[in-house]
Amino acid sequence: MDKTLIKELLADHSRNPRNYGTLTDPDAEHETSNPQCVGPTHPEGDEVALTVELSEETPPVVEAVQFTGRGCTLSQASASLLTEQMIGTPVEEVVEWDSETLEDLVGMDLTPSRLKCAELALVAFRNAVEER
């Protein structure tokens, strides 16, 4: 994907996040942060809180997912992009997503420090379903 298009996609998802909010009666939820990524709008680091609704079938499928958070463009855009992809996907498949999945989703290679930003929503999802 063209670098300009990637920047536009990430900026759009950061400014107009999809699935932003909190589910009223989630089956699973978790909040996580990356204190190493600080900025003027997020002096304590990136934060993502995820709420998830799962199907009753076996294996369960993600029926709904919403997030709230603050942080760098990459962390918030990735949370938006990830939640779009999670809906309708079996939980066991989502927990297997890795850095390659994230890089494909955001359209670029990620350094280890940027990967920590991009994976916040995925880490929150894994912890949420593990804790339920």
PLM region spans:
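Short beta-strand elements
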Residues: 46-56
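Short, thiol/selenol-centered motifs that function as redox-active sites or metal-ligating centers
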Residues: 43-44, 69-76
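Alpha-helical support elements that line or immediately flank enzyme active sites
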Residues: 78-89
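Short connector loops at helix/strand junctions that flank enzyme active sites
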Residues: 45-47, 60-62, 77
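Catalytic-loop motifs flanking and including active-site residues across diverse enzymes
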Residues: 74-79, 117-120
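Structured surface interface patches that mediate subunit assembly and partner/cofactor docking
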Residues: 12, 39, 49-50
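Short Gly/Pro-enriched turn/cap motifs at secondary-structure boundaries
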Residues: 33-43
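C-terminal binding/interaction regions
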Residues: 1-33, 55-57, 61-64, 89-132
